[in-house]
């Protein structure tokens, strides 16, 4: 299994079900003015021939804005996935999933571009990204 690096974050993450392959469109859960994000790559994935790199909650991805403010569109920017629809199993045996796929726009260090997050975020994301956890109103 390939190592999954975390740029600019502390802590480790257990293996999760990867629910968001490259070319997935996810909602933007912050107040930057972006409506949705298009995943173009996943940070820290080495991969295998013909296998699409995929992301899960807590992963940093490179994304572009497909709908939103004109000054945000047509630029590649880092984002962190905070919710996914695909169920994953936690170490305590609980299967967890959200009702949508969502991410927040960050800088290379993992600091949020926006100041607020709409909706809950996963505990796995909150453990890895403290700046995102402080802006979240609910951590599940």
From Swiss-Prot:
The record, for SMART domains, names:
Ribosomal_L14 (SM01374)
Record carries keyword Endoplasmic reticulum: no
Q: Which GO terms describe its biological process?
A: translation
Alphabetized, the UniProt keywords read: Ribonucleoprotein, Ribosomal protein
The GO terms this record gives for MF are:
large ribosomal subunit rRNA binding; structural constituent of ribosome
Q: Which Pfam families match?
A: Ribosomal_L14
Annotated GO CC locations? cytosolic large ribosomal subunit
Q: Which domain of life is it from?
A: Eukaryota
SUPFAM superfamilies listed in its UniProt record: Ribosomal protein L14
Give the similarity note.
Belongs to the universal ribosomal protein uL14 family.
Which HAMAP family does this one have? Ribosomal_uL14
Recorded protein name is: Large ribosomal subunit protein uL14
Identify the species of origin: Nicotiana tabacum (Common tobacco)
Taxon lineage: Eukaryota, Viridiplantae, Streptophyta, Embryophyta, Tracheophyta
